[in-house]
């Protein structure tokens, strides 16, 4: 019964959520687009001509937002974008115009190599400007296990950024306040000169979800 009441409460909040309504009106697949939008407006992350990687991209609202930003560039012509977007997720994702999508597990070597190949092609053998990660583990409710899973996902994103991000580039990841959060912050501080937590208004107040932004790699790969 308690679970049913929780589901009903969540459904009520979801239906009446202004960001859900805004996403439906503006054609975004999820309200998460507005989390990225707010952070981008604050930190000026997305700029014309960039190569951007979207980790944990499904259902695609972050890729949609990035695509819209790059398509708005004065240099974008014939309906194309000024830049490149590479997205990956273990789940399927409906196509987003101008976004190269890989379905696969980021942790598998063959999938990782496919991602690297596409990134190298998009950059002409160079580095990317921005790595976005909305990846999150399936939470078990066991704090220590969930913290370890979240930290592992953060490590994967940092390792990818270390190898493929421009020295002046940025990494934005989703994480959760609680057990293990301080370890993720310390890891970011080891790798980035500028580290800043972000809690956009579109992130629900009840949620422990937060975002961590790292800029300017200390030891680029």
From Swiss-Prot:
Main EC class the enzyme belongs to: transferase
Name of the protein in question: Ribosomal RNA large subunit methyltransferase E
Region described as Disordered: spans on this chain: 199-221
Localization of this protein: Cytoplasm
An annotated GO cellular component: cytoplasm
Reactions accelerated catalytically: uridine(2552) in 23S rRNA + S-adenosyl-L-methionine = 2'-O-methyluridine(2552) in 23S rRNA + S-adenosyl-L-homocysteine + H(+)
InterPro entries: RNA_methyltr_RlmE (IPR050082), RNA_MeTrfase_FtsJ_dom (IPR002877), rRNA-MeTfrase_E (IPR015507), SAM-dependent_MTases_sf (IPR029063)
Molecular function per GO: rRNA (uridine-2'-O-)-methyltransferase activity
Active site (UniProt): 174 (proton acceptor)
Residues reported in the UniProt entry to bind S-adenosyl-L-methionine: 60, 62, 89, 105, 134
UniProt xrefs under Pfam families: FtsJ
Record key words, sorted: Cytoplasm, Methyltransferase, rRNA processing, S-adenosyl-L-methionine, Transferase
Chief site of localization: cytoplasm
SUPFAM superfamilies per record: S-adenosyl-L-methionine-dependent methyltransferases
EC number: 2.1.1.166
UniProt function note: Specifically methylates the uridine in position 2552 of 23S rRNA at the 2'-O position of the ribose in the fully assembled 50S ribosomal subunit.
Protein family membership: Belongs to the class I-like SAM-binding methyltransferase superfamily. RNA methyltransferase RlmE family.
């Amino acid at each position: 019964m308690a679970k049913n009441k929780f589901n009903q409460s969540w459904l009520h909040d979801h239906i009446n959520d202004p960001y859900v309504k805004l996403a439906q009106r503006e054609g975004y697949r999820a309200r998460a687009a507005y989390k990225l939008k707010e952070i981008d407006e604050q930190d000026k992350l997305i700029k014309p001509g960039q190569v951007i990687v979207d980790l944990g991209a499904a259902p695609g609202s972050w890729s949609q937002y990035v695509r819209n930003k790059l398509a708005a560039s004065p240099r974008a012509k014939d309906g194309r974008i000024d830049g490149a977007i590479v997205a990956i997720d273990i789940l399927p994702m409906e196509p987003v115009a101008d976004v190269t999508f890989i379905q696969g597990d980021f942790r598998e070597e063959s999938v990782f190599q496919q991602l690297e190949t596409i990134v190298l092609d998009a950059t002409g053998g160079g580095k990317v400007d921005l790595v976005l990660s909305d990846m999150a583990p399936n939470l078990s409710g066991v704090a220590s296990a969930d913290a370890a899973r979240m930290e592992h996902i953060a490590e994967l994103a940092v390792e990818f950024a270390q190898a493929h991000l421009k020295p002046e580039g940025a990494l934005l990841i989703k994480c959760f306040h609680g057990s293990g959060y301080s370890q993720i912050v310390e890891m970011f501080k080891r790798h980035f000169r500028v580290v800043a937590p972000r809690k956009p208004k579109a992130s629900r107040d009840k949620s422990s979800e937060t975002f961590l932004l790292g800029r300017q790699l200390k030891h680029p790969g």
